From Swiss-Prot:
Homodimer. GO terms for molecular function: acyltransferase activity, transferring groups other than amino-acyl groups. Involved in the biosynthesis of melanin but also various secondary metabolites containing a naphthoquinone ring. Catalyzes the iterative condensation of five CoA-linked malonyl units to form a pentaketide intermediate. THNS subsequently catalyzes the dual intramolecular Claisen and aldol condensations of this linear intermediate to produce the fused ring of 1,3,6,8-tetrahydroxynaphthalene (THN). Changing residue 168 to S: Still able to produce THN. One of its GO terms (biological process) is melanin biosynthetic process. This is 1,3,6,8-tetrahydroxynaphthalene synthase.
């Protein structure tokens, strides 16, 4: 059964604190009639620090969509490979053991996808399948886990690599002056995450069931307005309240699996903002402490879009994981309004060691190639 292994995460070296964000807002929007409200909303996010791919002075300039997209491509090619290599090492696999790369990003555009460059540069087999996902926003982290689960269910000997690369700072638009835009300027950060889903063996979350749910008639609540200047992010004021209609979908998925969503051992969810976590605690009737990993990501990195779920899971690993067989929920939330949800149990490599030792890497690569040719 497919196992989601320890994620590798990297954030850029340029850091901006909440205090610096608030001061920038005061300086750049002195005469804005709703500045006090915007400042209060930014403070309420709880985001203490964010990491960005360029110095703040460069981020605040807008050289044009073309130049920004060049920065996206340059920084992705510079930073992603090391994150992938650590994820492969943590999963005890080689690049040639990977059968599919699922690449998610909503903050830049490349064609061919970065996956083609990665296959050429990092030694993945030329038959490696590519699944780039560009338009699911913050929900894409959960979607990538689910698509990897689906692939490994269809091909039980296969291994999937998930990569999330988000440079939200490249979407900053100095002419967007609505309160929602000012809030986003203090909420989003940049980050890269990668994780392997092994078809056999591995330590991590043994994925058992996944599902998706879209709240009807909410597709304009989170969206891009694409202009000559790039991606203009639009965030409706109703978004923070979306956990009330989404919580029943989480409960239903757990119920279909014979579980109670209010009585699980770990919760790894997208932290788009503090109210999402607070409301999930309320509507799922779960202790707020259960969402500590997601809240830590929000506090230290901000909303890093599709990479949030993987970073929160990384923090669970860093805490030492959980006991064998512990049951958990993973979920990403984003445009649509969409929830991508999965359920799984914790397993350690020792439990399935017999399986892993029966398949050498040479034999596994042979199986992998047969899967690709199927």
């Amino acid at each position: 059964m497919a196992t989601l292994c320890r994620p590798s995460v990297s954030v850029p070296e340029h850091v901006i604190t909440m205090e610096e964000t608030l001061e920038l807002a005061r300086r750049r929007h002195t005469d804005h009639p709703q500045l006090p409200l915007a400042l209060r909303l930014i403070e309420n996010t709880g985001v203490r620090t964010r990491h960005i791919v360029q110095p703040i002075e460069d981020t605040l300039e807008h050289p044009g969509f073309e130049d920004r997209n060049k920065v996206y491509e340059r920084e992705a090619k510079s930073r992603v490979p090391a994150v992938i290599q650590r994820a492969l090492d943590d999963a005890e696999l080689l690049a040639t053991d990977i059968d599919v790369i699922i690449y998610v990003s909503c903050t830049g555009f490349m064609m061919p996808s970065l996956t083609a460059w990665l296959i050429n540069e990092m030694g993945f087999d030329s038959t490696t399948r590519q699944i780039p996902i560009a338009q699911l926003g913050c929900a894409a982290g959960g979607a990538a886990i689910n698509r990897a689960h689906d692939f490994c269910t269809a091909y039980p000997e296969a291994n999937a690599l998930i990569v999330a690369c988000e440079f939200c700072s490249l979407c900053y638009q100095p002419t967007d002056l609505g309160v929602g835009s000012l809030l986003c300027n203090g909420l989003f950060g940049d980050g890269i995450a990668a994780a392997v889903v092994r078809g056999r063996g591995g330590t991590g979350v043994r994925l058992e069931r996944n599902g998706s749910y879209l709240i009807p008639k909410t597709e304009d609540w989170i969206m891009y307005d694409v202009k000559a200047t790039g991606f203009h992010f639009l965030l409706d004021k109703r978004v923070p309240a979306t956990m009330e209609p989404l919580a029943p979908a989480l409960k239903e998925l757990a119920g279909e699996h014979g579980w109670d969503a209010s009585d699980l051992d770990f919760y790894i969810v997208h932290a788009g903002g503090p109210r999402i976590l607070d409301d999930l605690s309320t509507f799922l009737e779960v202790d707020p402490h259960a969402f500590r990993f997601s809240r830590a990501t929000l506090t230290e990195y901000g909303n890093i879009a599709s990479a949030v779920v993987l970073d929160a899971l990384r923090r669970l690993f860093d805490e030492g994981g959980v006991e064998e067989g512990a049951r958990g929920l993973l979920a990403g939330f984003g445009p649509g309004i969409t929830a991508e949800m999965s359920l799984g149990c914790w397993q350690t490599a020792d439990v399935r060691r017999g399986i892993r030792q029966d398949v050498t890497r040479t034999a596994a690569r042979g199986v992998s190639r047969r899967v690709r040719q199927a």
